[in-house]
Regions:
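Metalloprotease/metallohydrolase-associated module, dominated by Zn2+-dependent proteases
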Residues: 16-87, 103-152
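Active-site recognition of the HExxH zinc-binding catalytic motif
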Residues: 90-102
Length: 152
């Protein structure tokens, strides 16, 4: 499970208990908030991943400022419901990048992003750079969509 967190640049699974495997982590049930006009799923490789907008419970999450989280076991991206547009966009792409890393197997044993801190650093840096590219070059998203629709 990975997410955007701002406590010493570490991910939630590292923050819980260092001696407990992350798949034994306490079940977290944040409150789902209805989000009209926002997507509720995204296709990443072969996976259809659900997107939920949640009211975080920082006490249970044992964090002070986590904007989103990707849980590959539940196949879900959770995004804090009350983020401003820029933070929501950045968090969405950030969590999609975590899912892409998992689908591509880049965080498996002996893979380049095996260590969670490596994955978080790469995902964070690439997300921030690409969000700048999209913001500063608004034509690029439309061009990519148009080019993907062309078959020849």
């Amino acid at each position: 499970i990975f997410g955007i967190c701002f406590i010493k640049n570490i991910t939630p699974d590292i923050m819980i208990r260092k001696n407990k495997p992350k798949h034994f982590k306490k079940k977290i049930n944040p409150i789902v908030v209805e989000a009209k006009g926002l997507p509720d799923n995204v296709r990443i490789g072969y996976k259809d991943v659900k997107i939920k907008y949640v009211r975080p419970d920082y006490k249970k999450w044992e964090m002070t400022d986590c904007f989103g989280e990707y849980d590959y076991r539940q196949n879900i991206i959770q995004i804090q419901h009350d983020l401003c547009g820029q933070e929501r966009a950045n968090t969405t792409i950030h969590e999609i990048m975590h899912a892409a890393v998992q689908v591509a197997g880049l965080n498996q044993e002996k893979a380049p992003l095996e260590k969670p801190e490596f994955e978080e650093a790469v995902v964070n840096q690439l997300t921030n750079v690409m969000m700048g590219v999209f913001r500063d070059n608004p034509w690029i998203v439309d061009m990519l969509k148009n080019q993907l629709d062309e078959s020849e």
